[in-house]
Amino acid sequence: MLEQMGQAAKAASYQMALLSSREKNRVLEKIADYLEANAEEILLANEQDLLEARRSGLSEALLDRLALNPQRLHAIANDVRQVCQLADPVGQVIDGGLLESGLRIERRRVPLGVVGVIYEARPNVTVDVASLCLKTGNAAILRGGKETWRTNAATVKVIQKALEECGLPAAAVQAIESPDRALVSEMLRMDKYIDMLIPRGGAGLHKLCREQSTIPVITGGIGVCHIFVDETAEFAPALNIITNAKTQRPSTCNTVETLLVHEAIAERFLPELSRAMHERGVTLHADARALALLSGGPATAVAVKPEAFDDEWLSLDLNVKLVAGIDEAIAHIREHGTQHSDAILTRTLRHADRFVNEVDSSAVYVNASTRFTDGGQFGLGAEVAVSTQKLHARGPMGLEALTTYKWIGYGDDTIRA
């Protein structure tokens, strides 16, 4: 089955690569319209997925991530329309010039070809990834989580209908509908057809892809994010930033998980932190010194387990650790961070510069929330993932990250001397 899907996707990718921006936008507009026109079918499939998910005992937080309603589906359709408004990077000349040999050379952006995406739980990812791949002239093979396989199948059916209405191959967007996990391992070895693989899920999925894939893999999305509160930080704005970074959407990968506090301000700062976190229902997991200062406060405070510094909470829980200064803060982030998003709150420019230069994460912030690590917030439009590695793409992956480039030489019967 996957062999046939790969062959069809590769053939479709050649056709998609030749489309003009206008032709691609026409497809996207039709997809957005069809999502709304076929809302009843998609929402019915989602209801069936939710019913089965409840029977299997999924938490309410996960059920909310799975759920669609007319408003959410309308928002997803509008997201597709927003992709239409983004500048098309395909065909852009990155650089080039006339060489001494007389050859005119240019480096031009082109589609990757076939993009494979393995993801869990979120039905909106199906449309997000498909729209970004189509905008960049790529084909896509999608493998969503078993929790939303009916929703994904119904959504892809609508996308394929829109493609065919525009005279394009339905195979430009395909979904692996079977929940059989053995198919994931098979997909990881489809380097003959898939040019880049993007896993969007937990640490286990990323580890599986890194270890077993014969396809280049873009990993990321695991966010053990830190905020270091320096001794010169102003308390009121610092608490506002921490509250935003922890409580705005606790289940996201750019949510802060560990707070590092300079020991010189701990006695004054931690009681205020306790009050702020209590108002939002946050449980504090503190090291011994921090726990002693937090124990009399209103927020629930417990002793932190050592392994908690290496894991995402993705909930209203926050690690708190006291550090002697910026050196210890940077050392902790290097040992426990995932190179996603880390921030310093300080009024000392020298410390801000050191943090920016020495913390090796895909996004580093000074006096700002880690929640900004997002394609839309960065002005990239939509994103296909957040990469925490260094090759090909890093940070929020917008349209450019779904392209590569080729060198093109124009000669006048030119030969090499």
Swiss-Prot record:
Species this protein is from: Cronobacter sakazakii (strain ATCC BAA-894)
UniProt pathway: Amino-acid biosynthesis; L-proline biosynthesis; L-glutamate 5-semialdehyde from L-glutamate: step 2/2
UniProt-listed InterPro entries: Ald_DH/histidinol_DH, Ald_DH_C, Ald_DH_N, Aldehyde_DH_dom, G-glutamylP_reductase_CS, Glu-5-SA_DH, GPR_dom
A GO BP entry: L-proline biosynthetic process
Main location: cytoplasm
Protein's name according to its UniProt entry: Gamma-glutamyl phosphate reductase
Pfam families: Aldedh
Top-rank taxon, per record: Bacteria
PANTHER family associated with the record: DELTA-1-PYRROLINE-5-CARBOXYLATE SYNTHASE (PTHR11063:SF8), GLUTAMATE SEMIALDEHYDE DEHYDROGENASE (PTHR11063)
Protease among keywords: no
